[in-house]
Amino acid sequence: MSIFRTIAMFIYLFGYMIVHYGVLRRAERALAAGDMQLVEELVNKHIPHWSRGILKVTGVFLSVEGLENIPKDTACVFVGNHRSYYDIPLLLASLDKPHGILAKEELEKIPLLNRWMKLLGCVFVQRDDLRASVRALNDATAIVESGKSFVIFPEGTRYKGEEGGAGEFKAGAFRIAVKTGAPVVPVAITGARALFENNAVSYTHLTLPT
């Protein structure tokens, strides 16, 4: 990833979380008190704003196709290809509201970010531990059963091959859909890999089912 884009992304990422630390604490207190309406209100306001801000300050222009095809009034399992670290803010900036994500355990160790991710409903997974992976999938299944949509990158890691390709899909995302009966919404992200290779203004595209 270009050094300038990396610096800009991390300055904005942590700068936003520090400036809005009071919002984080308010959301955590609401969660502890069982006020889920307030938690969702704060998360739905700030996480998309944070995601769009990252794209703006790093010179990323996003086009989205197919939002009208997302099933309404039901929890979905969003299944996307994984090309770069930008995939998460790209998705969070595109959907009508943010959703929990099956994320690698390393992200749980990042201060402030881990707390926002927990409020969002993210589930952290140890990819090299089968039992822990099963527990994580069960947790994600419970979230979908509760009526909330969830995002999974079924390759399990970023795909580093040619643009247009994809890694081997793991079965976890589809098991969640089968167990819950939730519709699977495929998401194709193109152009995200290029964000790692230059400092120029870049375009990326996100396609939902047609």
Spans of model-derived segments:
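Glycine-rich helix-loop-beta junction characteristic of Rossmann-like nucleotide cofactor-binding loops
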Residues: 67-70
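Conserved small/polar residues in nucleotide/adenosyl-binding loops
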Residues: 204-210
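Conserved Motif II region of HX4D acyltransferases
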Residues: 74-78, 138-185, 206
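A hydrophobic membrane-anchoring feature enriched in long, contiguous, low-charge segments
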Residues: 3-29
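Catalytic core of membrane glycerolipid acyltransferases/transacylases, capturing the structured
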Residues: 20-33, 40-44, 56-58, 72-130
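Short, solvent-exposed loop/turn segments at secondary-structure boundaries
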Residues: 128, 162-167, 199-200
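Short gly/ser/thr-rich secondary-structure transition/capping motifs
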Residues: 57-65, 133-134, 190-194
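Short glycine-rich, acidic/polar surface loops and turns
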Residues: 140, 173, 192-202
